């Protein structure tokens, strides 16, 4: 998969994630408000959201079927698209819960950076954005377009590498019994990490 294809995949998944692709699936705003209504604080709502989305990413049949609903080039594996879709819904919902504009280019780009997992801190730091500090909503709005382009370039490279490693996991998935367990652990582990990073980046 090329970096250009990866960025196209991210754009498709993010746009679809905001409104949902499954019948009856809630928009990000509705999803976020639903979690807020069922918990006593924003932090608890986010933790519950992360937990549920992490479980979804470990369900291989659901993820593969979900990826098939997205209109994508044949070179994009449906399970990869499905995982990214679920993870972006989680990240966008976290951002919305804490008051960020999920339709802005800035939030979209930072959401993409979160998908790189532990690499997100270095990518953002290189662009002058410190993940260890609370990113005020107004401060994020001031991140210039040129910086967003550079972040996207680094994100594309990291994600192509990341899902290349996932390809090795997919080979293992073909092994009876062991495959499903290994693949599920890989997806759930990454989703949990990504969720916690998004929680830190898109803080109140």
Model-identified regions with their sequence ranges:
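Terminal, membrane-proximal amphipathic helices
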Residues: 1-66, 85-204
